[in-house]
Amino acid sequence: MVQELCLEGLQKKQAEFEVNSAIDLFIYYAGWADKYQQVFSKVNPVAQPYFSFTVPEPTGVVSVLCSDNYPLKNAVSILCSVIVSGNTTILLYSESNPLTAMSLAEIVHTSDVPAGVVNILTGFRKELLTQFASHMDVNAIIYCGEKLEEFKEAQKLSALNLKRCIILNDEKLDRFYQEGPYTILRTAEMKTTWHPVGL
């Protein structure tokens, strides 16, 4: 994969950093897969004869439009934070880096990730933005990039079925890695359940 990143224009040292970061991110998020619900769930105190529980649940189908900067590291960090909470994803990889997209798809295909959970596409963002944002079966969209007019268009089209819209510009992507497990909550919904006691 380092050679592919070099073919796409990165220096060897930067390509090695990308691959090592991606491996670290896979391991990091794999560790959270069976822990994040215990960390973010809670029993709510109520003064009535009820139990009240709040637990994170997956949003559903999340479409992701990846950034051109640090293509592998950014794609893997967002991909892992989305699927670790039980979502499925349709990821539009950076149009200037299609080689690593295909290798990433092959890695996901040969791993234990169930078929259909991760769907990686390559293509032109301008052509696919409308479909990603307006499709009625998509529940959330993550836009990575600096083009504000593209995000506004995605936000407008997402209003048809009230998709959650998340924008991650380059500055936010840099901080994304420092948020730890809280990145998982971006595409999770908190569900509160009330249960009677002593009846």
Place the predicted regions along the sequence by residue.
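Conserved NAD(P)+-binding/catalytic subdomain of aldehyde/semialdehyde dehydrogenases
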Residues: 36, 46, 52, 56, ...
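General structural feature for long, well-ordered alpha-helical segments within catalytic domains
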Residues: 1, 18, 22-25, 58, ...
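A broad detector of the eukaryotic-type serine/threonine protein kinase catalytic domain
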Residues: 6-13, 67, 87, 137
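N-terminal Rossmann-like NAD(P)+-binding subdomain of aldehyde/semialdehyde dehydrogenases
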Residues: 1-51
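Conserved small-residue-rich beta-alpha loop and adjacent elements
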Residues: 31, 36-114
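Hydrophobic packing residues within well-ordered alpha-helices of enzyme cores
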Residues: 5, 26, 101-104, 132, ...
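Short beta->alpha linker loops
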Residues: 7, 17-21, 95-99, 123-124, ...
